[in-house]
Amino acid sequence: MAASESERTGGGNRPMAVIINDTTLRDGEQSPGVAFRASEKLEIAQALVNAGVRELEAGTPALGEEECVRLAILRRQLPDTVMMSWCRMNSAEIHDSARVGMDWVDISVPASDLLREQKLHRPWPAVIASLKPLVQLAHRLGMRVCMGCEDASRSADETLHMLAEVAADLGIERMRFADTLGILDPFSTFTRISALRQHWHGGLEIHAHNDLGMATANTLAAVRAGATHVNTTVLGLGERAGNAALESVTLSLDRCLHLDCGIDFTELPALCRLVAAAAGRTIDVQHPLVGGQVFTHESGLHVAALLRDPRSYQGIDPSLVGREFNLVLGKHSGRQAVSGICARLGYILSETQTLLMLQEVKRFAEHFKRNPGEDEVIAMCQMRMDDQIPFEGQLQAQGG
């Protein structure tokens, strides 16, 4: 297999506390309406690697020969990247995974009684008996195995502990705890992962969905409880409400848990734009780290403080992702903000001019439902300096 570098090591043998196994190309593409072209999958994979992602869940052979061809192309393009395929309990899919050069195969096992009965129609002893030759096959073909515990969040702890014992006996190196329906909270996630950790000493991967808006929080809780690997998708793409977002998870691991996951944050904005374009999605202006307005400030109190010290109302330095903070005028601006921003643009306003400007800015924001741009602020300043009719008067004259 192509990737021989230890999965616990980053560039230059730098120890890595958490391994990102990004599944944008597999689970992310399962978002309704998302279908990446072959060229887009190649671009996304390369951009993920450029950003420091060390493992890719690259796809599933169950989609057919075209998917297998794309997986083989990915393998050739990125020979040093650890790649995993997602498979059902199906020998043909395991053979296909080896044929296209996958390093790992995630063999999905329905862990809850509900899914096991609905999908496999067999009791646990029969399921385990079927799993054993599949794991042996993967090993003979030169792949490492992750047991993907599908719907683990609805499985009993006793069942997961039994599966951990089976995994150890079969030489499986990693277990995936999948909150498939996104029903856990950080507290229950910590409890469940901690309990599993008492029975499993290999790699442990958290796969969190965002149905309750807690995928990132649940991922961090799992890491606190002992997870060594985390699944992410760019922009949180995925089934239903999506998965844990790469950009949020990696920033939170860095800032909240002080853990290194090898990510170059300056690469994330371009990566997110690339994936958004390929997925036909827009990036919300308030999306953490990469949204257009996440480093923009309007509130008068905040702007006044930021003009004195940028640290006052910024917990994340925008230079982390190659950006700068932006101060704008709007309905919530105050006199100091107006005076300070206008001064930055080269206009020193009197107290009367500042008050008139403040009224004009508020009217502008209410009328146009946006902040005035820099050119518009300059025009307003020039009008104040020239004692021209204010914007409010223009609106009244136009019947506004």
Swiss-Prot record:
Naturally occurring in which organism (per UniProt): Enterobacter agglomerans (Erwinia herbicola)
Example of a GO MF term: homocitrate synthase activity
Catalyzed reaction equations: acetyl-CoA + 2-oxoglutarate + H2O = (2R)-homocitrate + CoA + H(+)
Function: This protein is a Fe-Mo-cofactor biosynthetic component.
Alphabetical list of InterPro entries matching this protein: AIPM/Hcit_synth_CS, Aldolase_TIM, LeuA/HCS_post-cat, NifV/FrbC, PYR_CT
EC class: transferase
Domain Pyruvate carboxyltransferase, residue spans: 18-269
Keywords: Nitrogen fixation, Plasmid, Transferase
Superkingdom classification of source: Bacteria
EC code: 2.3.3.14
NCBIfam families, per database record: nifV_homocitr
GO BP terms in the entry: biosynthetic process; carboxylic acid metabolic process; nitrogen fixation
Protein name: Homocitrate synthase
